Amino acid sequence: DGVIRMDGVLYVLEIKASTQQSTLINLGEKFPEPFVLEQWNEEYYAQAMTYCKFAEIENHLLICSDAGGRKLHIVRTPYNATYADALMLKAERIADAKEPPNKVGGRNFWKCKLCSFYGICYEP
């Protein structure tokens, strides 16, 4: 990951390997390229827009390989300042809140089990 200039355009560069690469490719056939990343994985899209915001770069370039690293697919996404600013406001609200936000899962939800705050939410 880093910053790259391609065809005179500056991009925040991310390189990912995913078992879901075929879904990404299929979405590229259904949606215009600027919308593909958000449709494919909203968490990756949020990450990309945050990187662009803090790097002050107007474009994001994802190079995604299949799990074996043999096939590559490229997706270019323009920076969405409105979306990135909304994420920052959400983070500020959570950080400044007197009470923690509602739990997104439960004690046995896999995302919760992987979270570094699991003990705060579920341990006595």
How does the language model describe each region?
Residues 1-35, 51:
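Conserved catalytic cores of phosphodiester-cleaving nucleases, focusing on short active-site segments
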Residues 25-27, 35-45, 50-124:
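Metal-dependent nuclease catalytic regions and adjoining charged, substrate-binding loops involved
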